[in-house]
Regions:
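Non-catalytic regulatory/interaction regions at protein termini and inter-domain linkers
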Residues: 1-212
Length: 212
C-alpha cells in the first residue's frame, strides 16, 4: 500500500516539476498524447500522501489525522470544481501553468470523478466503513484500468469516448495504482476476501486477475 501510494505522490511531483520547468515529456509522456494538467498532478500528490498517512502504521503514529483529512478535502475542492464547471459549462478558475488548449485547463471529467471516488474511499476508511472504502477503491481501480485499456487499444479510440477525451496516460496509471492501494488496504472484505479464499470462486478470481 505504501509503495503504491508514494509512487503516485511521486508521479504528481514529477509532473508538477515538468510544468514548472517546461519539460513536455514529463507532462505528456509521448508526443501526440494529452497532458496531465497541474491540478491533476497536485491531486495525485495529495491523494498519494493521504493514502500513505492514513493506511501506514508508522505514518498514523506520527502525523495528526487532521493533516490527511485536510489534503483530502482540498482534492474534493479541486476535483469538484473541475467536474461542476465542466458539467455546467462554466469557466474553470484553476488555470495556473495549465494547457488551456486542452479542456480549458481543467482535468478530464473522468479524472475528476475518479479523484472524488478515491476521496470517498479515504474518508470511509477514516470513519471505519471498510466495505464502502473497499467498494470505492474497486471503482477507482476499474476506472484506471479502463483508461489504460483504452490506450492499449489505441489512444485515438479512447479520445472519442466522452469524458475520457482528455485522460492522460499517466493519469490513468495513477488512478489504477491508487485504486489498487485502496483495495489492498481495506482488508478482508469484498473482492480481496474472495481472491484470498480457498473456494472455487477464489481460485477463479486468482486465475483471472493477472489477465485483467
Amino acid at each position: 500500500v505504501g509503495a503504491l501510494a508514494l509512487t503516485v505522490a511521486g508521479l504528481g511531483v514529477v509532473v508538477l516539476a515538468g510544468w514548472a520547468l517546461d519539460q513536455e515529456r514529463l507532462t505528456r509522456v509521448l508526443p501526440g498524447l494529452v497532458t496531465m494538467q497541474p491540478a491533476t498532478a497536485l491531486d495525485f500528490t495529495l491523494l498519494g500522501l493521504s493514502t500513505a498517512m492514513l493506511h501506514l502504521g508508522w505514518a498514523r503514529a506520527r502525523v495528526p489525522e487532521a493533516v490527511p483529512l485536510l489534503a483530502v478535502l482540498t482534492v474534493v475542492l479541486i476535483a469538484g470544481t473541475g467536474l461542476v464547471t465542466e458539467l455546467a459549462g462554466w469557466r474553470y478558475p484553476i488555470t495556473v501553468l495549465g494547457d488551456m488548449s486542452q479542456n480549458e485547463g481543467r482535468m478530464s471529467g473522468i479524472t475528476a470523478v475518479a479523484h472524488l471516488v478515491i476521496c470517498v474511499s479515504l474518508l470511509a476508511a477514516v470513519f471505519g466503513r471498510r466495505l464502502v472504502a473497499h467498494g470505492a477503491g474497486v471503482l477507482a481501480l476499474t476506472l484506471g484500468v479502463v483508461g489504460l485499456s483504452g490506450y492499449a487499444f489505441g489512444a485515438s479510440d479512447l479520445y472519442d469516448v466522452g469524458y475520457f477525451q482528455t485522460l492522460a496516460l499517466h493519469t490513468a496509471l495513477g488512478i489504477a495504482l491508487l485504486g489498487l492501494a485502496l483495495v489492498s488496504a481495506s482488508g478482508e472484505v469484498g473482492l480481496t476476501r474472495l481472491a484470498r479464499s480457498g473456494t472455487v470462486g477464489g481460485r477463479l478470481a486468482r486465475t483471472l486477475l493477472p489477465a485483467v
